[in-house]
Amino acid sequence: MRAWQDHVSGAAALARMRGPGQFRTKAGVRMFLMLCHTVLISCIQSGLPMPQTLIDLRREIPAEHQSGGPAWLVAEPIYRALQVRYDIKTGKLAILDEIVEALSSADERLASIFSELPESWKYHHVQMTQPDARVLGETCHVYPGLIESTTWNVARGIRILLAETMIEQLCLAVGEGDLYTLSDCHRRSLAKSITLLDMLGRAIIASVPQHLGVVSIRDVQNFGGEGHAVAVPAKKQICRAPSPPLTHEARARSRSEPTARTTGCLPLFDPTRSKAQNDKAERFMSLAGANHTIIWPLYVVGMSSACTPETRQYAIERLQVIHKETALEQARVVAGLLQGKVAPPTLSTELLDELPAVEMGTLPTMV
């Protein structure tokens, strides 16, 4: 934890010394925003809030240097989400009703930005005409550009962490008891969070093929992109990193690992704050320095309690491909972290069967 705090404090101090004067040029603004991104990932992994110094400085960026649109607007809700998680972690938020309200509000602020997107920011559903190992399943999403895809995935990653925290807190309230010890409202929140967690993870995975060059927006335009569903052939595969053989322990863990999709089980604790991670904080600093936009989203999905063994293996293989093609050490390190993930404790399927059904009207059509 000390490594994280030193990293965040040092970055904030550097930005404070430069002051608003760094915003006189586009280059200065760009460097500051890159710093904010690095600190953001560090804060996410360490459970720290975004330094107020950086938040205040960002608000002083002149309007002519602000990008505007969802990519700009999403930052403040993300910072708020980090603060909520920190307040829960430190006990500032300790009453269950207040915790649920704060987490729900933070998620809704993020969701509202994406519910009112212009058409130019929405992704297309693409059906592959032939199997491709770089696509999990038969469909993927194609975005107008990298900025759109990255913005969607950053928001999804934060929403996954909020959902994990919601599940953790509600499960801790249940303990060894019955789910009916929760109020109807809280049981609905639990059911919605479990469903949303799966939807968000699937959406991130569906964005991966475009990041790896399997499909592009040109394919959508060339194959009749006016509609939402488009069938396109996959591009020639450049290379594929072979998956290392699973150890006996890994095979056993894979066979026994519960999944939200097939068993309905869920974790009692947020897997992104495991003890093993705190013991290897220096390795997680790789995430803060990752300059390939899909590495952190793949990490979040792979560590999610809703991630199936199949999806986690897909994430590991894609990270290995990124490492092989780009030599980015961060991709190799994160792949190793996912390979070493231990399944969290879970609730029984019987308890989950008592959860109310999630009304589709309460879920967004696009996440």
What role is predicted for each listed range?
Residues 2-215:
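Central/C-terminal regulatory/activation regions of fungal transcription factors
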Residues 119-367:
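Fungal-biased detection of long, low-complexity, Ser/Thr-
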